[in-house]
Design a protein with these regions (language model features):
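C-terminal amphipathic helix plus adjacent low-complexity
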Residues: 327-359
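Nucleotide-sugar donor-binding patch of glycosyltransferase catalytic domains
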Residues: 252-255, 288-335
């Protein structure tokens, strides 16, 4: 029975959900597969996408960006953690090589902790990665803004990427030129489990009332201005925020069974920050997106640019979201600029097929 080891970056929820969609497709196509998932993401998040068995291996090989919420970054703490990993990389590599050999791993797939490429090389196991950007891309932008202490980290990550055997490059991507073998892939993500009619019945929502899903990833936002919802009594809002207030036109989704993508079929808008998984799943479902801008995070510009190309959208500033009156809900959505170039909607299928062909 083949064994595939999946390593997921220690940042937010989006990397976890998009790689989990690949694992779910694999398990559907091949039940005789040992799956190991190395991550610090909560187990419930994995289980919301996966129905098959897996070994939950709590490990962290990178940091991404340390944030207080989905928009605010702590660069100093990020640098400290990166330097710790870099200083202790030999020990981290040796420990994980021992684990890989003990579990007879045949293939490593990562999204997208760079150190895993070195771990795979030391273990003599092929390493494939998936992603739309590398962390060197994020940190290099900081270097160019004057944060020169990230320069050595950026070079280190680029060198690690060169050890990867194959990259599945997702839509909304930067060039990722540090990888030698690149295969472009379509949108990845989960598929909704319910129809619009089933969701309206289950949550007792009026089928003709306009609905907006408020979703901001695993890090959420500080102080979502819920008071603005009172200005739109004809709208039904939906949130996964556990701290949301009790409002007549706000439906709070509790527990971990449902995912944002499961609610998208009933929604006329998704209001979100720029994150790959939310935008990718919204594009797949075909629901328009109201997207906040995000300063200081270079991936956000690429994500927003891609959203404008491929989906109905409206781009708003954090100031309009936090301090404005939310009249963007009454504005006409912008049409996609390049609808004829929309990527394939089944990227997880292409990746799963390639993995199974290799095994």
């Amino acid at each position: 029975m083949p064994t595939v080891y999946f390593a997921i970056t220690n940042h937010g929820f989006g990397h976890t959900t998009r790689l989990s969609s690949v694992i779910a497709e694999l398990q559907t196509r091949c039940s005789e597969l040992n799956v190991i998932i190395a991550t610090t993401a909560p187990r419930w998040l994995l289980e919301s996408y996966l129905s098959g068995d897996f070994i939950y291996h709590q490990r962290s090989f990178d940091v991404g960006v340390i944030q207080s919420d989905s928009l605010n970054m702590d660069k100093a703490a990020t640098l400290d953690k990166l330097n710790y990993i870099r200083t202790n990389q030999s020990e981290l590599i040796a420990q994980e090589v021992e684990f890989l050999h003990a579990n007879h791993v045949d293939l490593i797939v990562a999204d997208i902790p760079p150190l895993v490429a070195a771990i795979a090389a030391a273990a003599d196991i092929p390493c494939w990665m998936t992603g739309n950007f590398g962390w060197d891309f994020i940190y290099q932008d900081w270097v160019e803004q004057g944060e020169i202490e990230f320069a050595e980290i950026t070079e280190w990550i680029s060198q690690l990427h060169s050890q990867c055997d194959r990259l599945f490059r997702l839509p909304f991507h930067e060039p990722m030129s540090g990888f030698d073998n690149i295969q472009d892939i379509g949108f990845t993500g989960g598929n909704p489990r319910f129809s619009r009619e089933e969701l309206c019945d289950r949550f007792e929502m009026c089928s003709i009332q306009p609905k907006a899903l408020l979703t901001f990833g695993g890090l959420s936002l500080n102080a979502i201005p819920y008071h603005n919802l009172a200005k739109f009594p004809d709208w039904q809002f939906i949130t996964f925020d556990r701290d949301a207030p009790d409002l007549p036109n706000l439906k709070q989704i509790c527990g971990h069974t449902l995912r944002p993508v499961d609610l998208m079929p009933v929604c006329d808008r998704v209001i979100s920050k720029p994150g790959y998984s939310t935008l990718s799943e919204a594009c797949r479902v075909g629901v328009p997106v109201v997207c906040l801008t995000r300063d200081g995070f270079s991936e956000a510009e690429i994500l927003i640019d891609g959203l404008q190309d491929y989906n109905h959208h409206l781009i708003v500033s954090p100031e309009d979201f936090y301090e404005g009156d939310w009249q963007f809900l009454n504005a006409d959505m912008q049409t996609p600029r390049r609808p004829e170039h929309v990527p394939d909607h089944h990227g997880e299928v292409a990746i799963a097929k390639t993995i199974l062909e290799y095994l």
